[in-house]
Amino acid sequence: MMFTKLIWMGFFCHLCRGYFDGPLYPEMSNGTLHHYFVPDGDYEENDDPEKCQLLFRVSDRRRCSQGEGGQASSLLSLTLREEFTVLGRQVEDAGRVLEGISKSISYDLDGEESYGKYLRRESHQIGDAYSNSDKSLTELESKFKQGQEQDSRQESRLNEDFLGMLVHTRSLLKETLGISVGLRDKYELLAHTIRSHGTRLGRLKSDYLEGGGQKMG
């Protein structure tokens, strides 16, 4: 009987010491539904909670506690109601974040219902801009061709005018040469006439002088 009591006392001492060398079971946390991973296999009250992996908890009983001063211990000291309150606040914060994201998305969508419609509208706008630019380029090319044709026509007209001026100048030069030849002939005729008139005047003078001398003698 005493031997049986000693066995039970040793078993309870073994449980109080918290030594665990088997697989991981929920029963190692005395039914609090905590799941802890103890690296050295020796579960004690002063185990570092950062070295224990907490999977889930529905009780405020602590097994891996470092004290009341640490942040992890303060988090583990929360009751289920407090945890629900914290979770509610986190959900509200997440809701506000999602609301901000949705507003930013709505700003990005510019009034459209989805990114697909927004992208389709943007693609249509890009297509319209491309078609307008292509149309403008076509008009510019046609105007450039028209300008080239006008320049070529103007150049040909200038060439024709220049050739006409050359022909007219040549005809004027030919006419001037003809006039100069005629003037030269007239000048020679006039010089011959003047010489003949001089000869006649000289003869008349000599005849007059001879006639006057005879009368006086």
Curated annotation (Swiss-Prot):
GO molecular function, one term: protein homodimerization activity
GO CC aspect terms: endoplasmic reticulum; extracellular region; Golgi apparatus
Subcellular location: Secreted; Golgi apparatus; Endoplasmic reticulum
Transmembrane domains' residue ranges: none
The family this protein is said to belong to: Belongs to the FIBIN family.
Glycosylation sites: 30
Signal peptide bounds: 1-18
Protein name as it appears in the record: Fin bud initiation factor homolog
Summary of subunit composition and partner proteins: Homodimer; disulfide-linked. Seems to also exist as monomers.
Keywords: Disulfide bond, Endoplasmic reticulum, Glycoprotein, Golgi apparatus, Secreted, Signal
A Pfam entry, by short name: Fibin
Annotated gene: Fibin
Lineage summary: Eukaryota, Metazoa, Chordata, Craniata, Vertebrata
Organism: Rattus norvegicus
